[in-house]
């Protein structure tokens, strides 16, 4: 199950019920579509990486990214085995919004990057994987990871800054990642 009993004998004798998340109860997959690389990882309920695959490219195209996913996913699932695969809840996908606007930043031909226009990333990943998909802006996803697993756990309200090829931001308000109406509230 998703929870397991974890209580000292003294509390058991008092009839207390203390439970914790069972790290083996649920598995999920995460996919990152980046400017120079893509990655797929399988994680447990605590966020620990169980297996992962990565590909590097000069610039992303829908064909490159989806071919990588189609080639990687079956091998990852084989590594996990039936017991773990049956516990997969879904796949989270993160990517920068409007990838077709990166022409200059990734030195890609216009025709290649325009292939992202109208390409429905969540629908393509759902069709390819057969899993439920949650799609989020890449920096909002990074903010979420910091909030769940990093120093962000210590604060209820903060601005998150990601500095890489570009500078992006995320917001945490009242202990919750705030994506905003458009999914990238922290963008600037």
Summary of predicted features, one role per range:
Residues 49, 53-157:
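Glycine-rich phosphate-binding loop and adjoining helix at the ATP-binding site
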Residues 139-188:
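Acidic, glycine-rich loop-and-beta core segments that form the ion-binding/anion-interacting portion
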Residues 36, 89, 186:
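Residue-level signal for beta-strand positions within conserved beta-sheet cores that form or flank
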Residues 15-51, 160-177:
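Gly/Thr-rich phosphate-binding beta-strand-loop-beta motif of the actin/hexokinase/Hsp70
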Residues 9-11, 21, 30, 83, ...:
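Generic marker of residues within folded, mature protein domains
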Residues 47, 103-105, 175, 183:
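Detector for glycine-centered tight turns/loop "hinges" at secondary-structure junctions
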Residues 1-23:
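N-terminal helix-turn-helix DNA-binding module of bacterial transcription factors
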Residues 44, 122-123, 186-188:
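Acidic-glycine-rich active-site phosphate/pyrophosphate-binding loop
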């Amino acid at each position: 199950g998703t929870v397991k009993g974890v209580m000292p004998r003294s509390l058991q004798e008092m009839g207390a019920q203390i439970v914790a998340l069972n790290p083996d109860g649920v598995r999920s997959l995460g996919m990152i579509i980046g400017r120079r690389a893509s990655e797929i990882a399988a994680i447990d309920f605590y966020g620990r990486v169980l297996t992962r695959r990565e590909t590097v490219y000069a610039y992303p195209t829908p064909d490159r990214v989806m071919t990588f996913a189609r080639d990687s996913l079956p091998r990852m699932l084989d590594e996990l085995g039936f017991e773990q695969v049956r516990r997969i809840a879904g796949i989270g996908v993160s990517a920068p919004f409007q990838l077709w606007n990166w022409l200059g930043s990734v030195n890609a031909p216009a025709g290649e990057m325009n292939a992202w226009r109208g390409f429905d990333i969540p629908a393509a990943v759902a069709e390819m994987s057969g899993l439920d998909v949650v799609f989020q802006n890449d920096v909002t996803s990074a903010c979420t990871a910091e909030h769940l697993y990093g120093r962000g756990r210590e604060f209820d309200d903060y601005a998150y800054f990601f500095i890489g090829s570009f500078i992006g931001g995320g917001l945490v308000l009242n202990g919750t990642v705030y994506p905003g109406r458009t999914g990238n509230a922290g963008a600037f």
